[in-house]
Amino acid sequence: MIAEQDLQFPPQRVLMGPGPSDVAPRVLRALAAPTLGHLDPCYLRIMDQTRDLLRKVFQTNNDMTLAISGTGSAGMEACVCNLIEPGDEMIVCVAGVFGGRMKDVAQRYGAVVHTIEVPWGTHVEPEKIAEMLKAYPQTKVVGLVHAETSTGMHQPMEEISQIIQAHGALLLVDAVTSLGGVPLPVDQWKIDACYSGTQKCLSCPPGLSPVTFSARALEAMDKRKSKVTSWYLDMSMLRNYWGSDRAYHHTAPINMTYALREALQIVMEEGLAKRIARHTKHHRMLRAGLEAMGIRYIPTHSLTTLNAIHVPEGVDDARVRRRLLEEYGIEIGAGLGPFKGKAWRIGLMGESSSRRHVTLVLAALESILQTEGFSLELGAALSAAAAAEKEAEVAVVV
């Protein structure tokens, strides 16, 4: 039962689900700064700083790099509706919920969609994309999910990007659960359109969607024969607001821009390479601890930011998650689609990727599972995590 005061003053949680992640105190303080007008010279300067920081985190020189007012789903729609006109052919790789969502969005905007579907928990092989491009040579856009949040799958990208580039199609990438936590060199991989969310590895509240478009993508937009179907997400108008013209388009979420700028500054202060290494280390610690309890991972290529694991046989998925929340204040995610009731998703993103988070969730899970009748060796998980941490530190020294 939720107490009435919890509705007025929400409780402090340890956010270790598929998102949002814990938010840094500095970011929360930035949210509380005075609200400015959306064309105030000071706010326009903050927008410029945010763009510069986004370019660094995306590792791109793309001129059109900005934050869409909306969540990652708005970023997805913005990328699709600006690149696709009715009748255009698009290949979409579906390895989980969010590949399926991209397919749905593309169809709604009139694309002729050709789908590459693989079993949940697996990734798309480059050969599949090469075969599909050969079968559909008029393909304009190839869309795939870099970090499939529903399965914890990490999609290898380099070879795929080379195949798509050689064909001449545009590469659209969902990086909602990877930007700021997993390597994502946009320019090096020749990604033409990429979108993310603020609430995952950037550890900012949800509400903005960072996006970036290559020169090739802008050229495709400029050659459109029809207007972009969405007025709100029309990048030709948003470009004028975020660019030098400063033409009014809509009232931006001012304070969320403050928060995003602060979150990006935190990323750059840590350094992208160190941040990615931190996510890798804590993933290895968590994985070692879970496997010491006899818990198996789902994906063949696991994300370091989102850990998808099988619920042990005979264990009540919802009951364990409820006990984690009520007894320890820890939130983890449930399974989706074919994994509903059969999987847990444990996020280690941004502020939520720390030694404290790993040891807390392992200790809590171990205690709860033991009382639920699951056979395990108490203390084995934390010992395994500590050993994995030591191995990671030795590897860094070497």
Residue ranges with predicted function:
Residues 123-180, 193, 201:
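Active-site phosphate-binding strand-loop segment of PLP-dependent enzymes
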